[in-house]
């Protein structure tokens, strides 16, 4: 993430829905039990990006709501792309009818790259 710093981030702690130890930097949402889980519906609304690795249900999960966060890419996209969530909780370029969750500050050259995203959660839908 050279060239960028995490300025004025806003994180909250929410109970994990299960073992999220391999889900760091994925988009998450709150389930019907009030716990955080990886979002698996492409283009859906999210609550934020998981910042840590909670290892069991009920453990606190740090979720970033605003600022600049690393996010795992689900596919390649350019810097400046408006991104949304894919079916694995990763970032992908938003298409028609999908919620925009941020702007890529760096390009993702392949799936599973970690890139800096300026979070703008649920900021609108692509027309």
Model-derived features: where do they sit?
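Surface-exposed, low-hydrophobicity beta-strand/loop segments enriched in small/polar/acidic residues
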Residues: 1-127
């Amino acid at each position: 993430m050279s060239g960028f710093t995490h300025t004025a981030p806003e994180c909250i702690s929410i109970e994990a829905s299960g073992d999220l130890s391999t889900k760091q930097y994925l988009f998450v949402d709150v389930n019907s039990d009030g716990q955080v889980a990886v979002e698996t519906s492409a283009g859906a609304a999210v609550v934020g990006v998981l910042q840590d690795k909670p290892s069991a249900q009920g453990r606190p999960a740090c979720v970033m709501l605003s600022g600049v966060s690393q996010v795992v890419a689900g596919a390649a996209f350019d810097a400046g792309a408006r991104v949304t969530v894919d079916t694995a909780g990763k970032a992908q370029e938003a298409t028609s009818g999908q919620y925009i969750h941020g702007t890529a500050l760096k390009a993702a050259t392949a799936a599973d790259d970690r890139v800096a995203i300026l979070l703008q959660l649920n900021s609108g839908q692509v027309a």
